[in-house]
Every structure is written in C-alpha cells, then in structure tokens.
Amino acid sequence: MAEQVTSARATAKIVRVAPRKARLVLDTIRRKSVNEAYAILKFLPNTSTEDIYKVLNSAVANAENNFSLDREDLIVKEAFANEGPTLKRFRPRAKGSASPINKRTSHLTIVVAEKEAK
C-alpha cells in the first residue's frame, strides 16, 4: 500500500549570499502559492531573489515530473536558508595590519506541497 506523495523539495548548496539576507526573502514567500511566490520574487530588489527563484523553479519541476503534482495546487510549505562554509579574506589596514572579512554562503532549501483541501 503506497502512500501518496504530496510534497517535493529542492536544495542549492554553497550559494554566495549571506543566510541572513536570504532569510529576509524566504520569509516573504513562505506559505504562499507558487504563482504568488513567483510574482513576489520577480519584483523584490534583493540580490538573493535570483538564486531563490531558481531553487523554487527546481522544486516545482520536481513536483511535476517526479510526483505528477499540479502546479496550480502547490504552495511553498517550507523555505529556509542554512549557513554554508565561510570564505575568509583579509583587508589591508594601516601600519601593516589587516582586518578579517567573512564572505558567507548559504544552503537554500524549498519544499513545495499540495494545498490541503478544507
């Protein structure tokens, strides 16, 4: 007796955007329909929207191709950004010293699921 699959996920690893900045965008699309999320991402000025758009596209494609779910019935069930590896750089300063610069990366995950019938 196979259980009906109602969700699909997509992940992007080591994306060159700070997790804190990615979370600002992910918080706006969480619990929205997929079409509404696309519209929001299209008009937000944040630089992380392009990477998040790609991950959302991949999650929707996984739902359609792997589980035969209808795109119109999908919502963004989960969307989160975890911390990836940090690129450590140095900025030269006065008197031969240097200050550390941390270039942060993220692991983006989006889960889409079918709307629950009321």
Swiss-Prot record:
Domain of life: Bacteria
GO CC terms: cytosolic large ribosomal subunit
GO annotation terms (biological process): translation
InterPro entries reported for this sequence: Ribosomal_uL22, Ribosomal_uL22_bac/chlpt-type, Ribosomal_uL22_bac/org-type, Ribosomal_uL22_CS, Ribosomal_uL22_sf
Xref: Pfam families: Ribosomal_L22
Sample GO molecular function, one term: rRNA binding
Keywords on record: Ribonucleoprotein, Ribosomal protein, RNA-binding, rRNA-binding
Protein's job: This protein binds specifically to 23S rRNA; its binding is stimulated by other ribosomal proteins, e.g. L4, L17, and L20. It is important during the early stages of 50S assembly. It makes multiple contacts with different domains of the 23S rRNA in the assembled 50S subunit and ribosome. The globular domain of the protein is located near the polypeptide exit tunnel on the outside of the subunit, while an extended beta-hairpin is found that lines the wall of the exit tunnel in the center of the 70S ribosome.
Family: Belongs to the universal ribosomal protein uL22 family.
Protein name: Large ribosomal subunit protein uL22
